[in-house]
């Protein structure tokens, strides 16, 4: 192992001079910073036996002349079933105070995307058990889903329900990468996962592995933590043949960290001050998220849109990779409908009769048409009232309100707060229920019967119970 000495430190960027052979680009170097092990990743060869590196932790306390050792390999992180229920950081160290993550294997975080010949070309729907998602914006196995939403509309609850349902319905594991998110939120998520049974702190049975690089971390760690999480997910796909769910919260912070590092490395910025390698960085991450002949990684990525500007290069670059978008709306959350998914704004590439079938496609489009008509009639209703509408429009509004309520659903992970048991609805029941409402088979039932139920049969039962209670 060749050794070198630090010659310059500028924030997160450290220059190291080697006497012997230069370490390769993207390989890891190690040095001591007080009692801590500091990992540096080689980013550039400067000539004159020097390399420029990015630090994965704070550089306070380092000084020129400190000794650095080349490891001869990229950053290696623990992978395998032992990571489930644990929290690790960008370099694979545990941050949950439960001791070392003892795994049989360690994998490098920089890996090539699967060969084209190994990728599966079949498009298959990943049934989530959440009605609004499965019907109107279905997820593809091995697809990439963008989750858009402001603060407090239920992104985290939706993510936890997806983790829970995939574990129940498919027996699959999930990996959660917290990229530049609030430490408090990361802590809350961990404890909520314990409360909802997704993570079992004592003993086996955990369904998720957590990889965190929070806002307080230096940009080097935030720019690499998504790759660490992805490597953990790739193990489950490639070695265990699993259908893995991979969550990134927030993909914008990955770009933001790349832009901070880029400036320190002396690259000339491109549009809006972002790094010139923006599309390449994003592509390297996204191309590894795919379905192979062994298993799949389906990723759900929370996307922060700076100043609500969808043309900003950071969100615009991630759009090119998405198969589906799930938009959470504050207006829907305000009327008490959870999950607060906007049925008209959310889209999916696989909502196509050749993939989902004619019946599913027809019902989804009919539901959207009724909701769109209701939306355009709302101004008239607000000004003139319902009585001024034609009989046909009154019927459409009544059905739309039932559909709107039927798109809500009690979640397993929210049982502790709501008191109502969670429901996982299969795709067939979802299509059948919405088709029946669109056809007017349940025009006689009150709209309240459709709120927070699973299948259409439960809505009928609820209506009967309401009628009995009213008669009593």
UniProtKB/Swiss-Prot annotation:
It is a peripheral membrane protein. Gene3D superfamilies: 2.40.10.170, Bovine Mitochondrial F1-atpase, Atp Synthase Beta Chain, Chain D, domain 3, P-loop containing nucleotide triphosphate hydrolases. Signal peptide: none annotated. GO terms for molecular function: ATP binding; ATP hydrolysis activity; proton-transporting ATP synthase activity, rotational mechanism. Keywords: ATP synthesis, ATP-binding, Cell inner membrane, Cell membrane, CF(1), Hydrogen ion transport, Ion transport, Membrane, Nucleotide-binding, Translocase, Transport. Its EC number is 7.1.2.2. SUPFAM superfamilies: C-terminal domain of alpha and beta subunits of F1 ATP synthase, N-terminal domain of alpha and beta subunits of F1 ATP synthase, P-loop containing nucleoside triphosphate hydrolases. The keyword Membrane applies. ATP binds at residues 149-156. One of its GO terms (cellular component) is plasma membrane. It catalyses: ATP + H2O + 4 H(+)(in) = ADP + phosphate + 5 H(+)(out). Its main location: membrane. HAMAP family: ATP_synth_beta_bact. NCBIfam families: atpD. F-type ATPases have 2 components, CF(1) - the catalytic core - and CF(0) - the membrane proton channel. CF(1) has five subunits: alpha(3), beta(3), gamma(1), delta(1), epsilon(1). CF(0) has three main subunits: a(1), b(2) and c(9-12). The alpha and beta chains form an alternating ring which encloses part of the gamma chain. CF(1) is attached to CF(0) by a central stalk formed by the gamma and epsilon chains, while a peripheral stalk is formed by the delta and b chains. This is ATP synthase subunit beta. It comes from Pelagibacter ubique (strain HTCC1062).
